[in-house]
Amino acid sequence: MCRLLGYSSRDAAPVAELLGPENFRAFTSLSALHADGWGMAWYAGSRPAAWKSPDRAGSERVYDKLGWQPLGDHGLVHLRWATPGLPVSDVNTHPFSYGDYTFAHNGAIYPQERLAAMLPPEWERQLAGSTDSERYFLHIMWRLAERDGDMIAAIADTVAAISADYTTTSLNAILLAPDAMYAISFYDRSMVPVEKLREFGHGDDADEVAAYFDLAYQATDDAVLVASSGWPMPGWTPLPSAHVLVTDRRTLATTVLPIRTANS
C-alpha cells in the first residue's frame, strides 16, 4: 500500500509550494507508515526525469530538497509501503518509466505467483523489478500500443483484465504522459489492510480505515493536484472509484471519466 501525489501547474514550481508548506509536511509525515521507499518524477519538457530511493522519505534530506525545487510543471510523488513478498529495493521503488510515460501505484495484486501471466513474454522481459505495480504499468503500455495511443481505452482494458483475473485491493495510480496526467481510482474498500494498519497504530479510526484508498483532487487556475488520503484535504473533490481524472497539461482542463469494466 502506498501514497500518491500528482500535479500539473501553469509553470514549473516546487511541489511543496503547490501544496503549501504545512500540507507538504503533512503528506510527508505519511512516510512514517509508508516507509519502504519514495520517488519523485517530473517533466520540464517532453521527457520524464526521476529520483527514487528505497529509504523513508521523511528521513532523507534529498526528499525535502527536491520538494522545494521547481523541477517541472508536471510530476508526481510516491511513498511506498511494500506488499509482503515484494522486496524493498531500488528497482522495485516507484515511479516506473517507459518511453515518455511514468507511473506510480497504490495497491496490491494477488496471487503473486501468477503475476508473470499478466503480460505477454515480450513485455515481461521489459521488467526492471519484480512488482505487481510495474507489471500493471507495462500492461497499460501494452494495451496503449494495441489501442493506437488511446490512453483511456488502454486504462479501461487493463483495469478490466486485471480485476477479472486477479484479486486486487486497489488499482489506484497516477500515470503521467507528456501532455496529460491520468489519476486512476479503482479500489475495494473491503480490502483495506486493517490488521496491518493496526500494527502501526492506525487501524482503530473507522473513518480513517474507510477512507484509506480514497483519492481526491484540487483544481485552481494555476494547478491541479491529486492525492491519496491520510492528511487534511478540506475543499478537495473526491474522485470516485472506477473513474479516471484526466488533466490536460497545457490548459489544466480536467475531465472525470468512468472506467468501464464488467463489474462497474
Task: Identify the residue ranges that each predicted region occupies.
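Long, charge-dense
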Residues: A116-L144
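Extreme N-terminus nucleophile/cap motif
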Residues: M1-G58, H202, V224, A242-V246, ...
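A conserved acidic, glycine/proline-rich C-terminal tail/linker
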Residues: F200-H243
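Short, compositionally biased leader-like segments
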Residues: G6-S9, Y43-G45, A50-H78, Y136, ...
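Conserved beta-strand-loop-short alpha-helix elements that form
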Residues: C2, Y101-P111
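Short acidic (Asp/Glu) patches
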Residues: F24, P54-L66, H78-G99, M118-W123
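Catalytic core of PPM/PP2C metal-dependent serine/threonine phosphatase domains
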Residues: D148-D188
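Gly/Ser/Thr-rich active-site loops/lids in small-molecule metabolic enzymes
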Residues: L127-G129, F186-L215
